[in-house]
Every structure is written in C-alpha cells, then in structure tokens.
UniProtKB/Swiss-Prot annotation:
Protein name, as recorded: Small ribosomal subunit protein bS16
One GO molecular-function entry: structural constituent of ribosome
Any Gene Ontology biological process: translation
SUPFAM superfamilies, per the entry: Ribosomal protein S16 (SSF54565)
InterPro entries in the cross-refs: Ribosomal_bS16 (IPR000307), Ribosomal_bS16_dom_sf (IPR023803)
Length: 101
C-alpha cells in the first residue's frame, strides 16, 4: 500500500510575522502535524525562499503532490518546469525501451 504524501507549508512564525517550512507529510496529517522531511522554508515578509532542490525533485518523482501555494513557489524558482522536463524525458525513454523490445 502506497502512502499518499503532500508537499505543503507549515507555519512556524509568530503573530504578525509569518514564516513557513516547506515539508513533506502524509496527506491525512494536520497542517501543523508531524512531517516526513523538511524541504526548505519561505518568508513572505522578506520574500525569501530557500529550497532543497534535489530532495524536492526526488519527492515529486516518488509521487508527492504539492499544494497550490507550494506549486506556485516551485514555478517561480524554476523547479516545477525542471520536474515536468524530467517527467517527459522519462516517458520518452520508457516508450523507446518498449519499442525496442
């Protein structure tokens, strides 16, 4: 049985000073519950984003679903476009292997 995981934001900032971690967690876990892996952080006040690119790509390739906000952040950083390119390359490679057989 495969566990459905999501990449989403969890708030760790104080009152009127938002700060978010970008984490991988089970889809059924509460928003501020336990997470599997920390993939970076986002500070909307300063507009600062720090991401672990390789870890994010690995989680996406394993089937993790990003939330809309995280997907927008990944698009702005160029990681989402890279993931789509990797996904298309894998499809083409699998198609070529199946034709070769």
């Amino acid at each position: 049985m495969k566990i459905l995981v999501k990449i989403r934001l969890t708030r760790v900032g104080t009152h009127k000073k938002p700060f978010f971690r970008i984490v991988v967690m089970d889809a059924k876990t509460k928003a501020n519950g336990a997470y599997i892996e920390n993939l970076g952080h986002y500070d909307p006040v300063l507009g600062q984003v720090v991401l672990k690119k390789e870890a994010i790509l690995a989680q996406l390739q394993n089937g993790a679903q990003p939330s809309e906000t995280v997907k927008n952040i990944l698009s702005q950083e160029g990681i989402w476009k890279e993931f789509i390119a990797l996904k298309d390359a894998n499809k083409k490679r699998k198609a070529a292997l199946s034709k070769a057989k």
